[in-house]
Amino acid sequence: MQHTRAHRCALSALVALTLIPLTACGEGSSRAASPSSASASASASASAAKKPYGHAFQKLERTYSARLGVYAVDTGTGRVVTYRDGERFAHNSTFKAFAAGAVLRKRSLSGMDKVIKYSKKDLVANSPVTEKHVTSGMTLRDLCDAAVRYSDNTAANLLLKELGGPKALNAALKKVGDHVTHMERYEPDLSTWDPHSTRDTTSPRAFAEDLRTFVLGDALGKAERAQLTRWLRTNTTGGELIRAGVPKGWAVGDKTGMGSNYGGRDDIAVVWRPHAAPLVVAILTNRTEEDAKPDNKLIAEATSTVVDSLT
């Protein structure tokens, strides 16, 4: 779709207005992650300015002409690093981790050999695995593998349909305490972000806490949790994101996302450290220009700041 220069500038100005740090660092966390009130935001902004990492995140935003949202928690100490953690961002393909988790929760590991049939008309862009198996169909297990490890869009759509649609995944997330996330569309439409809308958005805090619940908590049984963890740890799409910002020897299980406009780029991860409890990290970003391209270095550098702040 073509846009006039004036329209693009207007949208850019709208996004730029959000470039004000709203959140700070503290001890512990809350499962609820609704946007802050004006007074709370003002207080948090003042607190954030006193934090060394707050300045680092502000610098990254200026450097990359971006809006950056961060929520990270040390699950051993409860210490957190937060920056715009209650603001809404497009979640893009990061939701696929939870689509797989919700299918595991619904079917259990014993039900993952169910074969799902589909046709060529079901295929959408960025479906490197499912496009090879139109004739035979794929098991739920293999669809989860394709969606999480290769970010296969058709696989994700088939998982959503297995659950009952995007709103069914939304309901599944509410059951584990997430009342922030909005799931409304299928791939690839959900990757187009509208700054005026809340559809297909979440907050860094909400998705970090969802990931913690599914991978480290009790949302899944032991076997199902182990399977989801294996998919995340063997993800093929995250080498330049959170994985690039942690020290050698640390293990990362992540799910990435990329928007089709505003340079949207996201990554959510559980990070296992030697001799210490895991970190859970969610970094969601967008650029200020509608036609901007994503830059993986923004997330890698933000991750390095998180690591420095929590270790």
Model-assigned labels for residue ranges:
Residues 2-19, 23-40, 49-57, 162, ...:
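Structured C-terminal helix/loop/strand segments within mature extracytoplasmic catalytic/sensor domains
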Residues 49-85, 271, 281:
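A short, well-structured edge-of-sheet supersecondary motif
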Residues 61-64, 72, 101-111, 120, ...:
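Sec/Tat-exported extracytoplasmic proteins
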Residues 67, 160-216:
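Mid-domain, small-residue-enriched loop/turn segments at the edges of structured enzyme/sensor domains
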Residues 78, 89-121, 147, 281:
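Active-site SXXK
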Residues 123-159, 166:
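Conserved catalytic neighborhood of penicillin-recognizing serine enzymes
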Residues 209-258:
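Conserved active-site loop region of the serine DD-peptidase/beta-lactamase
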